[in-house]
């Protein structure tokens, strides 16, 4: 059986990656930096510099490399391999390498998966990613009362009970892009 980490997921629309921009998103709890190099290739990387752990989405897309904002280390498009350390410009670059993820761009959508699967097939989406789907890729804040939030959490726990088993500690509801940490929401006791 293929795990969620091995399946392709839409993480951005092509419009989210304008020239030399770095886009930040999450997939199954993994924070990602998504960017397009000047040759048009999309990169999906763990959103942490291997040097000091700073978010790479705060960095600079310099065309064929992503430059960390903190110490200026540069990582090559595609491989994520460190290619330049400003403190040692004449030395061989560090062996540091950003964790990269498989990605592809299909009909206006950027797809990624966190683990390689046995099959190397790419997502086959013949329909373009429309505005309604693209808008769901973004975060939305919806004000609601504590009573409404408790009701939503009860429904989510019921809906995902077959997947989650009997434990609801730290549940993340990711199916619609809505992430709820039940412990932080302070409503865990309400669900029991």
Residue ranges of each PLM-predicted region?
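Rieske [2Fe-2S] iron-sulfur-binding subdomain
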Residues: 1-41, 76-192
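A residue-level detector for conformationally permissive "hinge/kink" positions
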Residues: 21, 64, 71-72
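Short Cys/His-rich metal-coordination motifs, predominantly Zn2+-binding knuckles/fingers
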Residues: 28, 52, 71
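Immediate flanking context of iron-sulfur cluster ligation sites
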Residues: 36-44, 55-64
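Short cysteine-rich clusters marking metal-coordination/redox-active sites
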Residues: 49, 68
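Short functional micro-motifs and their immediate structural scaffolds
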Residues: 54-57, 74-76
């Amino acid at each position: 059986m293929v795990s969620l980490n091995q399946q392709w997921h839409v993480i951005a629309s092509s419009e989210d990656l304008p020239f030399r921009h770095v886009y930040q998103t999450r997939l199954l709890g993994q924070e990602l930096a998504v960017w397009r190099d000047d040759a048009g290739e999309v990169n999906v990387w763990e959103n942490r510099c291997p040097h000091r752990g700073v978010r790479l989405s705060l960095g600079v897309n310099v065309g064929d490399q992503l430059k960390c904002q903190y110490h200026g280390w540069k990582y090559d498009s595609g491989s994520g391999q460190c290619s330049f350390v400003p403190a040692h410009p004449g030395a061989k670059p560090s062996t540091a390498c950003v964790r990269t993820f498989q990605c592809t761009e299909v009909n206006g959508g950027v797809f990624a998966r966190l683990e390689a699967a046995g099959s190397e097939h790419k997502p086959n989406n013949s329909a373009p990613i429309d505005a309604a789907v693209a808008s769901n890729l973004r975060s939305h804040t919806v004000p609601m009362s504590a009573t409404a939030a408790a009701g939503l959490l009860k429904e989510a726990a019921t809906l995902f009970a077959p997947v989650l088993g009997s434990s609801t500690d730290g549940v993340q509801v990711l199916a619609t892009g809505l992430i709820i940490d039940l412990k932080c929401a302070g409503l865990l006791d309400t669900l029991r």
